[in-house]
Amino acid sequence: MTLIHPTAVIDPKAELDSSVKVGAYTVIGPNVQIGANTEIGPHAVINGHTSIGENNRIFQFASLGEIPQDKKYRDEPTKLIIGNGNTIREFTTFNLGTVTGIGETRIGDDNWIMAYCHLAHDCVVGNHTIFANNASLAGHVTIGDYVVLGGYTLVFQFCRIGDYAMTAFAAGVHKDVPPYFMASGYRAEPAGLNSEGMRRNGFTAEQISAVKDVYKTLYHRGIPFEEAKADILRRAETQAELAVFRDFFAQSARGIIR
């Protein structure tokens, strides 16, 4: 059986595993590498120094590895790296990285990216995330594991969203969202704990209670932020589910939502 449609345009320098399926009118550039059992629908365009792993499913009209929307970009050989087992739906756009950033845009494994989502240059997305339709990341955004972005979520450049966090429909994320927390609103504010997401991913009632106490410490007890952070970091030394806060606070540059 022919796995590549005869109307697809694939540069002879591109490296595709023999099991890759390519739909009609798809265009694949010379510096693209695609791993085993990845399926690409019709009318997709994959350019740039783009590496795509195994068992991905890329739907029609996706645009992957196009140059970043950055006026400083001067055709440097920056990268887009996509892991394994991702679903990338219609009209998604993933841009290359920039030399003024980390030089690459990275997406991990088992992510579910719905239609019309956008990942700008130098974004880093972890594993097992869900991006609902039209969620968009500006440049240099970091998304942790098991994050859920509601439809039309917009994330400002350089923001971080921690593991297991969740945003509501049309959230405008202008500061960092701590792990496990929910954010909502045009200028996103804390909206409670993603306790249902934690339960679905195997957290115990005791672990959820410990994280809930962190939320209360940050937002409901009137404690100055630096004192609250120090208290959380002390608890993180003995409570494994709180360890993610240590790295999150250390890497946060924009401050957290309040």
Curated annotation (Swiss-Prot):
GO terms for biological process: lipid A biosynthetic process. The gene is lpxA. Homotrimer. Keywords: Acyltransferase, Cytoplasm, Lipid A biosynthesis, Lipid biosynthesis, Lipid metabolism, Repeat, Transferase. It comes from Neisseria meningitidis serogroup A / serotype 4A (strain DSM 15465 / Z2491). GO terms for cellular component: cytoplasm; membrane. This is Acyl-[acyl-carrier-protein]--UDP-N-acetylglucosamine O-acyltransferase. InterPro entries: Acetyltransf_C, Acetyltransf_C_sf, Hexapep, Lipid_A_LpxA, Trimer_LpxA-like_sf. It catalyses: a (3R)-hydroxyacyl-[ACP] + UDP-N-acetyl-alpha-D-glucosamine = a UDP-3-O-[(3R)-3-hydroxyacyl]-N-acetyl-alpha-D-glucosamine + holo-[ACP]. The keyword Disulfide bond does not apply. One of its GO terms (molecular function) is acyl-[acyl-carrier-protein]-UDP-N-acetylglucosamine O-acyltransferase activity.
